[in-house]
A protein has these predicted regions:
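A short glycine-rich, Lys/Arg-flanked "PGG" loop and its adjoining helix->strand segment in the class I
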Residues: 335-347
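Class I S-adenosyl-L-methionine
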Residues: 1-97, 106, 273-276, 280-282, ...
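Conserved SAM-binding loop of SAM-dependent methyltransferases across substrates and taxa
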Residues: 260-272
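Conserved beta-strand signature within the Rossmann-like core of class I S-adenosyl-L-methionine
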Residues: 345-353, 357
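Conserved class I S-adenosyl-L-methionine
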Residues: 250-259
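Conserved SAM-binding loop
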Residues: 289-292
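Class I SAM-dependent methyltransferase SAM-binding "motif I" and its flanking Rossmann-like core
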Residues: 9-12, 79-139, 309, 359-380, ...
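A contiguous loop/helix-start segment that scaffolds small-molecule binding in enzyme catalytic cores
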Residues: 1-6, 18-19, 69-70, 140-230
């Protein structure tokens, strides 16, 4: 199959090069969104076949099977989070030529006369928050985001402020390239909340000041369980455990027995690319992790309240790093359960507070056919010595 993928703007009077007009003139089968069809309909041959690109896409590609050559219209640059990428994934052996125009974020930057060579681009179009969360935590100074009807500018602004990211201003571009409907608004995040914008739209976030990004958060800074500092992993131990987990190289992290969420929060701040799932049996943990993630600006940590041994984990992404901060007297059984999900090359780190739990961990690791890679003993002030032990 051969595909010609033509990028276009949202302008009703959209113009095309002579090469593209010649291509359209001899084309037989065309495809694109309903808006694209409205704009180009008068330029197509009378006997043209048109295939609407709508979800589910399986039906679209089923129709494509009947034709050897298809001309596809897409918005902006079809290779920028666009339909050309979908074609490449679905039909990797198909021949393709792309005719791009400026994508929407480029166009918005042009309207602002804003250099965008170092802009971090994220797509929220049918996608989770992960990439935007990562950009905010990293402190990227310029972020361009593609929106959809669910993740609107208002909802994005509200979520940013919920987690303390008031250090950006937002510019929203609406119907960019459409001479009759285009709008550009630069606003504070507070001004964006509750405001409705025409669709399609996109936005650029410009950092107004550098937000503090902590490393080694003091225990006293967290909201604590009944005010008890002894119930939180101490900063030196927390950082050593995270170091032994080697999270630079990992993708999915499970934090078992999160209590205040300190380990998950520290991990998210230093390794914002991680998918983190945190587990806690105490109901109070829900309030604590909600308070602390918002205090320290760590959106995206998924938490699960209940006995880890009774939770159904089958729908969660399998971990390649696991921290055990609490085991409720079921350490041996917990290791067996973790072993069923831990990806090849993954590791576990356990903070042992007693000789008995250290012995149980060693024996439990041996029983599941794994081995101890490293262990370090640390004593903080007048607290009991902790052994941080890693298994692979």
């Amino acid at each position: 199959q051969r595909f010609y993928v033509i990028g276009m703007t949202d302008d009703q009077s959209c113009t095309f090069s002579a090469e593209i007009l010649q291509l359209m003139g001899r084309g037989k089968v065309f495809s694109g969104g309903k808006r694209h069809h409205e704009i180009v309909a008068s330029l197509l041959p009378e006997d043209a076949v048109w295939i609407d690109i709508t979800v589910p896409l399986d039906k679209v590609f089923s129709q494509y099977e009947a034709y050897a050559e298809i001309i596809v219209f897409a918005s902006g640059d079809p290779l920028f989070f666009g339909f050309a990428n979908t074609l490449k994934k679905r039909l990797p052996n198909a021949w393709m030529r792309v005719y791009p125009v400026f994508n929407s974020l480029q166009t918005l930057a042009h309207r602002l006369v804003l250099p965008y060579h170092d802009m971090r681009t994220v797509s929220l179009t049918g996608r989770p928050w992960q990439n935007l969360d990562e950009a905010l935590i990293r402190g990227d100074k310029l972020i361009g985001a593609l929106t959809d009807r669910e993740k609107t500018p208002s909802r994005i602004a509200a979520r940013m402020l919920e987690y303390g990211y008031d250090n950006y201003r937002m510019t929203v571009g609406v119907h960019l390239g459409n001479k009759q409907a285009e709008e550009v608004h630069t606003l504070s995040l507070d001004e964006v909340i509750g405001r409705e914008f025409g669709f399609p739209n996109c936005l650029i976030l410009e950092q107004t000041y550098q937000r503090e990004r902590l490393f080694g958060i003091p225990e006293s800074s967290f909201h604590l369980l009944d005010g008890r500092e002894k119930m939180i992993t101490k900063s030196p131990i927390r950082l050593q455990a995270l170091s032994m987990l080697d999270l630079h190289q990992k993708h999915t992290f499970w934090d078992i027995g999160f209590c205040t969420g300190s380990v998950s929060i520290e991990a998210k701040l230093q390794f914002p690319h991680l998918q983190i799932h945190a587990f806690e049996c105490r109901p109070e943990g829900e309030t604590l992790i909600n308070l602390n993630t918002r205090k320290f600006g760590t959106p995206g940590i998924e938490y699960h309240i209940g006995d880890f041994m009774e939770l159904d984990l089958s729908d969660l992404p399998a971990p390649d790093a696991v921290f055990i901060g609490g085991h409720g007297g079921q350490l041996t059984e917990m290791l067996q359960k973790i072993d069923r999900y831990l990806l090849p090359g993954g590791c576990m780190v356990f903070n042992s507070v007693s000789e008995n739990s250290l012995h149980l961990f060693r024996e439990g690791i041996k029983a599941i056919g794994r081995c101890i890679e490293n262990e370090i003993g640390i004593t903080v002030e007048s607290y009991n010595s902790i052994t941080i032990i890693k298994a692979i």
